């Protein structure tokens, strides 16, 4: 649940985006500039948070009046081993030290719905975080580090799977399906695509983030839509964007004996905080990305 420190929306004096070269970070910086909000984008080329002493380098760039957004993370597609987890924890530790030293006005930390165990099928603001993956445990540890010193100014956003044209992760879902269709004319599904997962369009996640920044909200928000289509449904939506439609192939599941995982979200918390928040239906988001890709190809 979120609590607003600003009674009315107010543009931040400056937003420092740590992890600004990534999919979400670059979209956030673009939207901030579009809205006329001062933004300082920082990447690992500016401050490498895996390195000892990086907290001093980051703190030296910050002002007490800043709103600070933390996105830096090595996602599972970059590695699932212990070394990657430890690097992520080091980044979180150094960021927390810098944030505490700079005493910024507002902090927004991007976590993940991986903080909930894979077998957690229904998630609301009240659901206990019980990760069963190193990635989820890492994000929860980072949350705890920040809450221990900055709880009074901290907002945590826990997004689900994010999709958009500029995504670089090639994650299973709309992004990968579109690229498969474009390259090979077919989409490969695990099993029959029964698994149901929420997917949020990048523009909607950025809109939620801007609202959190303007209201200087604290607490936790789920970065989700409240709809969980099956991967088969998503594949069909992507396939029909092409002419002829992409073929859909069903591959054997890696572990047929394992249960099919589903996850559904209750978005009451976000709608209570922002009653007019609206989300792009997956069918509209998939069609929009296809148009954007076509326009980019012919630009």
Each model region followed by its residue ranges:
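N-terminal Rossmann NAD(P)H-binding glycine-rich loop of SDR-like oxidoreductase domains
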Residues: 3-34
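Short-chain dehydrogenase/reductase
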Residues: 85-86, 127, 131-140, 167, ...
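NAD(P)H-binding glycine-rich loop region in Rossmannoid oxidoreductase-like domains
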Residues: 52-89
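Conserved Rossmann-fold NAD(P)-dependent oxidoreductase catalytic core, especially the SDR/UDP-sugar
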Residues: 94-134
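NAD(P)-dependent short-chain dehydrogenase/reductase
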Residues: 144-197, 202, 238
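Active-site Tyr-X1-5-Lys
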Residues: 118, 130-155
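C-terminal substrate-binding subdomain of Rossmann-fold SDR/epimerase-dehydratase oxidoreductases
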Residues: 185, 190-192, 197-299
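Adenosine-cofactor binding site in Rossmann-like domains, unifying the SAM/SAH pocket
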Residues: 39-57
């Amino acid at each position: 649940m979120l609590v607003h420190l600003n009674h009315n929306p107010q543009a931040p004096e400056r937003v420092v985006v740590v992890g600004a070269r990534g999919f979400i970070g670059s979209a956030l910086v673009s939207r901030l500039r579009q809205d006329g909000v001062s933004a300082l984008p920082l990447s690992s080329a500016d401050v490498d948070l895996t390195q000892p002493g990086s907290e001093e380098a980051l703190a030296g760039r910050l002002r007490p009046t800043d709103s600070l957004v933390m996105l830096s993370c090595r996602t599972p597609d970059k590695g699932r081993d212990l070394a990657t987890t430890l690097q992520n924890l080091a980044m979180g530790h150094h960021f927390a030290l810098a944030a505490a030293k700079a005493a910024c006005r507002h902090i927004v930390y991007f976590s993940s719905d991986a903080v909930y165990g894979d077998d957690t099928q229904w998630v609301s603001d009240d659901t206990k975080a019980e990760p069963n993956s190193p990635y989820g445990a890492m994000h929860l540890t980072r949350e705890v580090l920040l809450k221990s010193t900055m709880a009074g100014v901290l907002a945590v956003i826990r997004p689900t799977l994010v999709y958009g044209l500029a995504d670089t992760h090639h994650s299973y879902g709309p992004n990968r399906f579109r690229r498969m269709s474009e390259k090979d004319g077919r989409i490969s599904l695990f099993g029959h695509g029964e698994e149901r997962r929420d997917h949020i369009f990048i523009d909607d996640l950025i809109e939620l983030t801007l609202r959190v920044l303007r209201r200087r909200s604290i607490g936790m928000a789920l970065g989700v839509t409240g709809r969980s289509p099956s991967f088969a449904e998503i594949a069909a939506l992507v396939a029909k964007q092409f002419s002829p439609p992409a073929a859909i192939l069903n591959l054997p599941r890696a572990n047929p004996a394992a249960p099919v995982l589903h996850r559904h979200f209750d978005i009451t918390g976000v709608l209570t905080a922002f009653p007019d928040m609206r989300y792009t239906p997956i069918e509209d988001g998939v069609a929009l990305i296809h148009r954007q890709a076509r326009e980019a190809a012919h630009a």
